[in-house]
């Protein structure tokens, strides 16, 4: 692409051995003395690119070298799991990589729809869980951290992921870490990380315009349809992304608008977003820039259906709302490579979320200020290390909090050392973080450690194993948020919540299968997660002094509250496939896998603390005994036993034909009071004990003049599905999309 490539290893190789090595600076410049080595080669290598080699006797100074992108030709490169960019098969932790084609060809208008295709990932409404690590927490608190270009992007007070905020028009790739990453990314990463990496321009100026229009079908049950024959729920939107590079300046700018007049009567959403990135590349190893996003969004919240049999697309009285939000972030950053080979990286972020009430005034706001400094250095070909410090300051305002506003501080220090000797790569890391809310609490994570190894069994086959501690501080909302949800249901904060901690163990094998210049990664893994003082939202009755349920105006009174439920253990296994191959000369891309997990509640069923009893239940859960496990209280609530996901597409000349299937198992256990409160829920759960399956299909025509036309059908068979109790997933939808590249 003619882009500058900093950090390339330049070495003199004689008889297969490296005798001298340096690294190119941030501008791609290098100087190396080759006198006396005329019979040797000058070799250029960098993770994600093919190695180039030149005979020293034949080269002339100055030398300009172009490296071919191995990320597309021979593999995937990731940055989320280590100090620097590395081939995905060399990582010590499990990472899945989602490429832009998957977002474009499936019309993923938000990050949620893209990440949901990842094996082992379950998204309940908007709450994400990796390998059963999370239940459902009603939009507050997340065990999975979202990163945007290396920094966390969880809202300051709610601690939630704003899926619609990510600039999909600028997607470079998304990396999903499927294990605890607290030692790297702190609180919020106890169940994994989703890292959205945005694109930078190549040497060629490029503008991409996208537009789509779609419609929802009528549901299977005609009584759910709240619209008349003159109207059908529709969705449409458009985006633009412009990317341009000058001599020492890079620019990315874009915008997005979207409207979803959805099948849920109060779930409509409209949004408009602007985004920009600017990077300067002066001389002397310096690189700096700034990026920014601003989004206005109107969205309806649909919490519980009115009645499954007759009005599942209408909300229960009092459980819906119409919200208006404004989100923005500004990210100044700087990197510098010193003469000793050290790398200095400073990243900062200001992130604001604000909700407006119907009168237009602000009813809730959170300002998040954060900064991170990292120093990294490769001491030799065997050892590299990084150390750093992190600070976030959160200022949150809401009439639902005590004292109306709250201020919290999260300082942290961290470090990591990586070793590489022959086929073996090792990683050791640690982090210490504090959570301070003046006048309320001061808590510490203690030292959080991780260790891992990766061993190349043979060329193209790598074994990995890792162990990592995790922790999560309770969010402000979990501690303080209190409100009335509907008649008979309140949400009550819990100031006594303790931080949760955990341990994650994982081992796996990744095998790279080559198809000429194409590659498919096959991965198999086993895993176990343990949590202490696990925080889960629980539905409970409000009791009077005699222990009876309080009745107000003939309505039983209940409340949701976040509780430390105690000890839990989740174990399972997973396989996945990701990449591109050729079958009979036809390019085929595949992404998917299957996960099975057993989520044991060791506090309700204390016998499972014994590993032997836990393994017995794990094995029994394969059969028809899961009902007895529910009765015994052996299972964590709001989890399923696993899922199967597969997305596949093939190119036939200018035509691309693709489809996907998602198979989600039944949620075995929920708060049983739900069956009494939500009309028709018990009947719904009796009907769908086998879980749900969804089939999607798409057809893409790639025209010769940089135009692309797509027809995408989601939920092709118009099946009834649900991601969590009390809400139905979308019926069939059909979308036409047009893309054009200037």
Task: Name these PLM-found stretches.
Residues 117, 151-180, 230:
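Short acidic/polar hinge/loop motifs at secondary-structure boundaries
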Residues 210, 527-530, 556-673:
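Gram-negative outer-membrane beta-barrel transporters
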Residues 345-355, 464, 498-559, 563, ...:
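Membrane-embedded beta-barrel scaffold of Gram-negative outer-membrane proteins
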Residues 112-151, 155:
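Extracytoplasmic beta-strand/coil segments of soluble accessory domains associated
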């Amino acid at each position: 692409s003619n882009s500058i490539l900093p950090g390339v290893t330049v070495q003199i190789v004689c008889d297969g051995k490296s005798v001298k090595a340096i690294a190119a600076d941030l501008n791609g410049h290098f100087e190396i003395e080759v006198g006396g080595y005329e019979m040797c080669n000058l070799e250029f290598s960098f993770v994600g690119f093919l190695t180039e080699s030149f005979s020293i006797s034949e080269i002339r100074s100055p030398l300009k070298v172009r490296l071919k992108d191995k990320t597309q030709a021979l593999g995937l490169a990731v940055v989320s799991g280590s100090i620097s960019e590395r081939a995905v098969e060399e990582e010590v932790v499990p990472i899945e990589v989602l490429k832009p084609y998957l977002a474009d060809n499936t019309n993923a208008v938000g990050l949620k729809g893209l990440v949901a295709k990842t094996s082992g990932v379950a998204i309940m409404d908007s709450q994400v869980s990796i390998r059963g690590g999370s239940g459902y927490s009603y939009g507050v608190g997340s065990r999975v951290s979202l990163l945007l270009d290396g920094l966390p992007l969880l809202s300051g007070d709610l601690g939630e992921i704003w899926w619609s905020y990510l600039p999909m028009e600028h997607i470079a790739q998304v990396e999903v870490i499927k294990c605890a990453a607290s030692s790297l990314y702190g609180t919020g990463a106890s169940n994994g990380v989703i890292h959205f990496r945005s694109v930078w321009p190549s040497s060629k100026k490029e503008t991409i315009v996208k537009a789509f229009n779609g419609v929802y079908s009528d549901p299977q049950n005609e009584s759910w349809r709240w619209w008349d024959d003159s109207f059908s729920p529709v969705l449409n939107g458009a985006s633009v992304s412009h990317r341009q590079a000058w001599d020492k300046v890079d620019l990315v700018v874009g915008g997005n608008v979207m409207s979803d007049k959805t099948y849920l009567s109060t779930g409509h959403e409209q949004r408009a977003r602007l985004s920009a990135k600017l990077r300067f590349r002066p001389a002397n190893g310096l690189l700096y820039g700034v990026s920014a996003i601003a989004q206005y969004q109107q969205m309806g919240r649909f919490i519980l259906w009115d009645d499954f049999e007759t009005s599942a697309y209408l909300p229960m009285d009092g459980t819906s709302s119409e919200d208006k939000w404004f989100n923005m972030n500004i990210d100044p950053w700087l990197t510098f490579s010193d003469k000793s080979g050290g790398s200095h990286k400073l990243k900062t972020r200001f992130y604001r979320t604000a909700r407006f009430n119907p009168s237009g005034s602000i009813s809730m706001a959170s300002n998040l200020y954060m900064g991170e400094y990292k120093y990294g250095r490769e001491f030799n070909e065997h050892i590299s290390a990084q150390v750093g410090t992190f600070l976030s300051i959160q200022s949150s305002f809401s009439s639902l909090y005590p004292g109306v506003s709250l201020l919290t501080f999260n300082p942290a220090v961290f470090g990591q050392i990586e070793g590489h000797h022959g086929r073996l790569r090792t990683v050791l890391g640690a982090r210490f973080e504090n959570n301070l809310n003046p006048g309320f609490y001061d808590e510490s994570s203690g030292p959080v450690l991780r260790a891992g190894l990766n061993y190349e069994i043979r060329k193209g086959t790598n074994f990995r194993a890792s162990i990592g501690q995790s922790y999560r501080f309770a969010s402000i909302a979990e501690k303080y948020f209190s409100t009335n949800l509907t008649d008979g249901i309140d949400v009550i904060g819990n100031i006594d919540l303790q931080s949760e901690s955990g341990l994650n163990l994982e081992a796996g094998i990744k095998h790279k299968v080559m198809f000429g210049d194409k590659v498919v990664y096959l991965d198999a893994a086993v895993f176990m997660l343990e949590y202490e003082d696990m925080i889960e939202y629980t539905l409970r009755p409000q009791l009077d002094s005699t222990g009876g349920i309080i009745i107000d105006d003939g309505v039983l009174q209940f409340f949701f509250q976040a509780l430390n439920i105690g000890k839990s253990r989740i174990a399972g296994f997973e396989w996945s496939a990701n990449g591109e191959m050729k079958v009979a000369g036809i390019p085929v891309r595949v992404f998917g896998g299957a996960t099975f997990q057993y989520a044991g509640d060791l506090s309700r069923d204390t016998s499972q603390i014994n590993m032997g009893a836990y393994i017995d239940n794990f094995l029994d859960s394969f059969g028809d005994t899961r009902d007895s496990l529910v009765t015994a209280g052996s299972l964590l609530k709001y989890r399923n036993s696993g899922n199967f996901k597969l997305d596949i597409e093939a190119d036939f000349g200018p035509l691309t034909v693709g489809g996907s299937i998602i198979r989600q198992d039944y949620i075995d256990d929920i708060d049983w009071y739900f069956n009494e409160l939500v009309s028709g829920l018990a009947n719904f759960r009796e009907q769908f004990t086998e879980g749900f399956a969804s089939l999607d299909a798409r057809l893409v025509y790639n025209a010769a003049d940089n135009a692309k036309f797509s027809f995408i059908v989601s939920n092709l068979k118009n099946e009834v599905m649900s991601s969590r109790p009390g809400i139905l997933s979308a019926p069939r939808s059909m979308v036409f999309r047009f893309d054009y590249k200037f």
